[in-house]
A protein has these predicted regions:
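Active-site-proximal beta-strand/loop segments in catalytic clefts of secreted hydrolases
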Residues: 1-3, 30-33
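Short N-terminal secondary-structure initiator segments
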Residues: 1-7, 121
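Conserved alpha/beta-hydrolase "acid-adjacent" motif
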Residues: 5-12, 38
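Conserved loop-alpha-helix segment in the C-terminal half of the alpha/beta-hydrolase fold
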Residues: 12-22
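Alpha/beta-hydrolase-fold serine-hydrolase catalytic core, especially in secreted/extracellular enzymes
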Residues: 22-23, 31-36, 41-128
């Protein structure tokens, strides 16, 4: 997430992303999330202490939502770039910010592909 207090965001994962040279360089960011948003679900052993459990939960994001978003984006990426299914490439957002905005005409901007209307708030998708 963009509030990663372990690896850092601006001078950590974002900086690494910006320095990558791959042709298909993408990064999905959960806004206001810290470092501990994965893997999910938390293993049973982690419930023994609060310290261990803290590695698997984030105060801003529900793990079910995180899993669904990651599954959606991962499948779109793999289908597009590994399987060569170009129709699935359309599910990789073209617009960086997931937030939909209401215009002067009271109509909202389109949601990201594969997301219901007004359902993808708090995500950013970086392309390089």
């Amino acid at each position: 997430g963009d509030q990663d207090n372990t690896s850092g965001f601006k001078n950590g994962v974002k900086k690494l992303h910006d320095q990558m040279g791959s042709e298909h360089n993408y990064m999905l960011v959960f806004e206001d999330a810290r470092h501990n948003i994965g893997p999910h679900p938390a293993p049973a052993a982690s419930f023994a202490t609060d310290f261990e459990l803290g590695h698997y939960f984030d105060p801003s994001w529900d793990s079910e939502t995180i899993n669904r978003v990651i599954e959606h984006m991962s499948l779109a990426f793999l289908d597009c770039h590994v399987k060569g299914d170009t129709a699935r490439c359309d599910y990789l957002p073209k617009r960086q910010d997931s937030q939909q905005y209401e215009g002067a005409d009271h109509k909202y901007t389109d949601p990201w592909p594969g997301f219901p209307h007004l359902w993808a708030s708090g995500l950013k998708f970086y392309r390089k």
